[in-house]
């Protein structure tokens, strides 16, 4: 596997989606949880970024994960409703996954191998964000406590790069 475009994932409805459908877009791939202390800030700021840059080719791909303190116990339909109702935000939501361990998503295994974390590669908490360029290559990994607005410079640079 050489880029995120090589992966197929399941959307919130359980349908197969090829990430090659996003060729030419700049992606923020993020593991999300509804009951995390980081939820409000991340969803609010991701929505703001998408509102500004979607027209330029930015997409947010959200992968619910319940591996961290059980902070995403809901089903995908409830997660989608929560995010839409509370934040007026509609990221592209995918099926709930594991981001670490024996049952980890192949996509997140690839992301971690391409851009390891501080001290070790495992995803440490909810809202670890990967910025992916228009070519499907990972540009940068941002930790859970990095505010999405602090990614804006890197997002602008990525959006400026044409294929």
From Swiss-Prot:
A GO term for molecular function: phospholipid-hydroperoxide glutathione peroxidase activity
Keyword ATP-binding on entry: no
Keywords from the UniProt entry: Cytoplasm, Oxidoreductase, Peroxidase
GO BP field: cellular response to reactive oxygen species; innate immune response; regulation of peptide transport
InterPro entries: Glutathione_peroxidase, GPX_AS, GPX_CS, Thioredoxin-like_sf, Thioredoxin_domain
Compartmental location: Cytoplasm
Catalytic activity: 2 glutathione + H2O2 = glutathione disulfide + 2 H2O
Enzyme class: oxidoreductase
PROSITE patterns tied to this protein: GLUTATHIONE_PEROXID_1, GLUTATHIONE_PEROXID_2, GLUTATHIONE_PEROXID_3
Entry annotation: catalytic residues: 36
Main location (coarse class): cytoplasm
Record-level GO cellular component terms: cytosol; nucleus
SS bond partners: none
Record has Oxidoreductase as a keyword: yes
Stretches that traverse the bilayer: none
Enzyme Commission numbers on file: 1.11.1.9
Protein's job: May constitute a glutathione peroxidase-like protective system against oxidative stresses.
Sequence similarity: Belongs to the glutathione peroxidase family.
Protein name: Glutathione peroxidase 1
Gene: gpx-1
């Amino acid at each position: 596997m050489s880029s995120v475009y090589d992966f197929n994932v399941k959307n919130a409805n359980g349908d197969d989606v090829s990430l090659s459908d996003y060729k030419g877009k700049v992606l923020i791939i993020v593991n999300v949880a509804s009951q995390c202390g980081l939820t409000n800030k991340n969803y609010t700021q991701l929505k703001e970024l998408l509102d500004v840059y979607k027209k330029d080719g930015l997409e947010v791909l959200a992968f619910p994960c319940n591996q961290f303190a059980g902070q995403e116990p809901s089903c995908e339909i409830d997660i989608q409703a929560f995010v839409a109702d509370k934040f007026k935000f509609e990221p592209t939501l995918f099926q709930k996954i594991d981001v670490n361990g024996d049952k980890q998503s192949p996509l997140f295994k690839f992301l971690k191998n391409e851009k390891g974390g501080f001290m070790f590669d495992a995803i440490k908490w909810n809202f670890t964000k990967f910025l992916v360029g228009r070519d499907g290559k990972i540009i940068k990994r941002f930790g859970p406590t990095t505010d999405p607005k602090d990614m804006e410079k890197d997002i602008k640079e990525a959006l400026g790069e044409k294929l």
